């Protein structure tokens, strides 16, 4: 039991130290960019860009998304739009046609495909890769609402170093953040991920990750690495590792922003996050060999980072919870049965280990609150007193769901391997109008 406690405590302290390093990196990044002057001066040249929108039963939101893309502040003659209604049973295809027929979009380069192929989102992207005429491919999900300069900033970033920056990615913001308690918590999570974690990793290690939406990638480069993996649950993570393995960079275009809808029901949220967790597990396991090979150091760091987050640190938190509650239960039982021993303690007659676990929890809560408050402070209009109280409540509720989702996803991955199951269909997140 002492070994379990030592390993658990060491693991938690390591995770806290790592999180603090990334947090400090992000703070340094934002301190250097604390002014509000945004440079949108004309580019030396505007490469042709193919914007791809994969959509599966998205008739509620696809019209808004299509209009937002067609209204982007980028030369219209340098934009090709490919819309895919993939195996839809609703009016997604018809909604796309309605937008295309609007007078204000007459003459625009729009191709609409009523697709019946396989492979999910990755399959759509591979079909688009064969059709694309642009030097770069930009991807937006069907619920995305890019701001007018989103594409401009993505292109500007890759043009800073076209040889190394084969891709760029922006930030995503929650469209429906005030809908309910769940969406408010998701909003805080996304703000921390985008404003702290992604920024910190890029600033310190020049490591970027392809998100599911609002990213740009060199067309010929994608072809050279074999495109997207059909059926991948997280095609974005999978191709990110391919890019890093090639020695190229996925550059952060922090001024490129797009709004996206988040799940508004617990069931929808759970299924989405389980799919993401499963996909990330599969990618990590597939790339684990690079830890011990002569591959790119960024790949090694990312594999180690993912392994720690999804396996080591997650297990440590579960063990710490078990140790804490087992000890508390034993202490309560001692009030009635004095001979009961505390199961996890360096000295069976003291409660130091319980106090240490409480101290660990306090450290984790403080760091959690610090991350959220710094992230919110870096985004206009987000840092409020309500957000602080929400962060505290979400730590005790929403953030604990990550453990449940992770354990469920691990079990599902193991069963997939045993039963040789393959999940290649779309997993639909319910959309809402507005």
Residue locations for each model-derived region?
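Cell-envelope/extracellular polymer assembly enzymes that use nucleotide-activated donors
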Residues: 47-50, 80, 223, 238
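Acidic helix N-cap motif at the loop->helix transition within catalytic regions
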Residues: 63, 90-99, 149
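Juxtamembrane C-terminal module of membrane proteins
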Residues: 22-46, 289-303, 330-434
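N-terminal signal-anchor transmembrane helix
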Residues: 23-78
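Long helical/loop segments within the catalytic core of UDP-sugar-dependent glycosyltransferases
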Residues: 100, 104-107, 113-135, 148-233, ...
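Catalytic donor-sugar/metal-binding loop of nucleotide-sugar-dependent glycosyltransferases
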Residues: 231, 240-259
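A conserved acidic beta->alpha catalytic loop
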Residues: 76, 85-94, 117-118
